[in-house]
Amino acid sequence: MAVKIRLKRMGKIRDPRYRVVVVDSRKKRDGRVIEEVGVYQPTENPSYINLVSDRVQYWLGVGAQPSEAVLALMKITGDWQKFKGLPGAEGTLRQPEGKTPFVAPDNGSVIIPEAITPKAEKAEEAPAEDAAPAEDDAEKAE
């Protein structure tokens, strides 16, 4: 039985997500798998790659052949270099930057002074100006 490590397509149309699986080479792309050893989500920025390194090393050790796409993923994570004994086993995988948490104001108020717009002040001034011409029109009518 020839065993391959390849991608199994998941997700929706135009939103691909893949599972990295160990499968008999004679099975269909999305057919029955022996073991799932990772996840690949190319649409995220940076791409999300998660391989279970010890299981990948085991399957490579017993003779499983990676597909071209999985080989590229293994080079990014450093699993291929680790298997071959090459330098660079730490890989080149980039981690996403963390989001900065929201910090509430010190005085406990939910309203932030910078959030108040000057439009509110202009709106208060405008009705006063509109009321003055209306009074002038009333005097002219008398």
Curated annotation (Swiss-Prot):
Keywords: Ribonucleoprotein, Ribosomal protein
GO BP annotation list: translation
GO cellular component, one term: cytoplasm
PROSITE patterns named among the record's database cross-references: RIBOSOMAL_S16
SUPFAM superfamilies on file: Ribosomal protein S16 (SSF54565)
An example Gene Ontology molecular-function term: structural constituent of ribosome
Biased composition (Acidic residues): 126-142
Chain segments carrying region Disordered: 88-142
Keyword Ribonucleoprotein found: yes
HAMAP family in alphabetical order: Ribosomal_bS16
Family assignment from sequence similarity: Belongs to the bacterial ribosomal protein bS16 family.
The protein's name: Small ribosomal subunit protein bS16
Biological source species: Kocuria rhizophila (strain ATCC 9341 / DSM 348 / NBRC 103217 / DC2201)
Gene coding for it: rpsP
